[in-house]
Amino acid sequence: MAKGKKNWVFCDGYLPPHGDNPEFEGHEALMMTNLTGKVANISLTFIFEDKDPVVIDGITLDAMRTTCIRLDHPLGKDGFMLGESVQYTIWVKSSTPICACFGRLDVRQTNMAYYSVEGYTF
């Protein structure tokens, strides 16, 4: 039985702006784990409300490894930046089944909020 799925969709992307305290970095992150014995070749498709999708290819995740991709940092070989306060969806496509979750740390209030969610899989 496969451990994970090849397609994951996370619909609630919205990189929060930075708060007033420079010591804390608000961010979003995509965490992926490969529980198989094969390397996973992964692409990320960012889907927006008002512009064409952006595809980031060339992500590899070795067998029995995990990774965390910070979405507030440059992505891919071209250094694509999401930008703050932009609504988006991430479609994760993998050559082999993986597990994935999405997390957000919002630091705009003193009682910072972090949450993670499992995406829709198929």
Spans of model-derived segments:
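Gly/Pro-rich, tryptophan- and cysteine-flecked surface segments typical
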Residues: 1-122
